[in-house]
Curated annotation (Swiss-Prot):
Gene this chain is encoded by: lgt
GO cellular component terms, semicolon-separated: plasma membrane
Descriptive protein name: Phosphatidylglycerol--prolipoprotein diacylglyceryl transferase
A GO biological process held by the record: lipoprotein biosynthetic process
Pathways per UniProt: Protein modification; lipoprotein biosynthesis (diacylglyceryl transfer)
UniProt organism field: Pseudomonas putida (strain ATCC 47054 / DSM 6125 / CFBP 8728 / NCIMB 11950 / KT2440)
Family statement drawn from the similarity comment of this UniProt entry: Belongs to the Lgt family.
Chief location category: membrane
Disulfide feature: none
């Protein structure tokens, strides 16, 4: 069994002002995505400057934060937030939904693309390889917060999370680290290598959707479902897995479509 590192969720406190690691992980994810996007910008559109890229990253970040929070409220704990709506704004306590953030990013990309003469999938193909940086950073934030841990286990790398998080004090799968390894590291490597060669429009977006859906679906088998929801069906299907099914199917469809559709005829 491995010891859980006791890390204060508050990274820095100045008087009443507290800066949480969870929030810093979002800043790291956004900053890392911007740096990587800067490297890939010339291939994407040589006419774009850093200012336009910064605008894109800003609006996508708003999509992540607003969509992620509203997604958690709608998908995971609607009754609690309806009873006390002020809880919606306490983002530093956790409670973000990837699937909600994903929807927020898609809406932001759709809006930004229309304003800047870019198709939705052109932007999504450009953005997809940037996303694992934020996903990986977010999972480290979950780990520091001692939240979203896994089921009891006797594997050698099991961890006992703090009593405030797990009163049962059982050795558990550190599922946040599994997700960091898969959604952060593995997904980044796959998309980075896949997108290095020219791909038809929608292929990179499809690969992201497919791989994320598979990775998340797999980890959910060892992750404890949200207490207020439990299992949705069959005694094992979680809300996270249910939301991943359309991502897996959609990813397969996009990849097939990208490689099999007829090229659009260009006007003479």
């Amino acid at each position: 069994m491995l010891p859980y590192p006791q890390i204060d969720p508050v990274a820095l406190a100045i008087g009443p002002l507290k800066i949480h690691w969870y929030g810093l992980m979002y800043l790291i994810g956004i900053g890392g995505a911007w740096l990587l996007a800067s490297r890939r910008l010339n291939r994407f559109d040589p006419t774009w400057n850093r200012e336009k890229l910064s605008d894109l990253v800003f609006w996508l970040s708003m999509g992540v934060i607003v969509g992620g929070r509203l997604g958690y409220v709608l998908f995971y704990d609607l009754h609690a937030y309806l009873a006390n709506p002020t809880l919606i704004f306490e983002v530093w306590k956790g409670g973000m939904s990837f699937h909600g953030g994903f929807i927020g990013v898609m809406l932001a990309a759709l809006w930004f693309g229309k304003r800047n003469n870019k198709s939705f999938f052109e932007l999504m193909d450009f953005v997809a390889p940037l996303v694992p940086i934020g996903l990986g950073a977010g999972r480290i934030g979950n780990f520091i917060n001692a939240e979203l841990w896994g089921k009891p286990t006797d594997v050698p790398w099991a961890m006992i999370f703090p009593p405030f998080s797990d009163p049962a004090q059982l050795p558990r799968h550190p599922s946040q680290l599994y997700q960091f390894a898969l959604e952060g590291v593995a997904l980044f490597v796959i998309l980075w290598l896949f997108s290095r060669k020219p791909r038809p429009t929608m292929a990179v977006s499809g690969m992201f959707s497919l791989c994320y859906g598979i990775f998340r679906f797999a980890v959910e088998f060892v992750r404890v479902p949200d207490a207020q929801l439990g299992y949705i069906a069959f005694g094992w299907l979680t809300q996270g897995q249910l939301l991943c099914i359309p991502m897996i199917v959609g990813g397969l469809v996009l990849i097939w479509w990208a490689y099999n559709r007829k090229p659009t005829a260009k006007p003479a």
